[in-house]
């Protein structure tokens, strides 16, 4: 099971069955997710980063690329990539802080390592500033500082 971030605001959850998963367990999980938590459920194959992270992290990486190319600031980009375009107010960089910068780096590395034939493979590289923040312990919301700092 994989929740989309931030889970309290995002409607979808992914269920990823293995070959040995009991269908009754999946049915029970889907029922719990839909009726108790009010989530929409998407079934996904067991592939690197499932559906949500493949699309979401690619979107973040593309945004990072364009942020650098157009010399934009993080606040400016989040102002453009949140509710203005139908996304959560956490937008791009704040969502990265919520997910955790260490988690982001792991997902990016997984994409780079496991998807060599993807046409966008050249973008599956964490920027140097991400590594610098992680090395300082600025892992995002869970550490009180990441791309943004809680004051």
Report each predicted region and the residues it spans.
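N-terminal glycine-rich phosphate-binding loop for ADP-containing cofactors
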Residues: 1-151
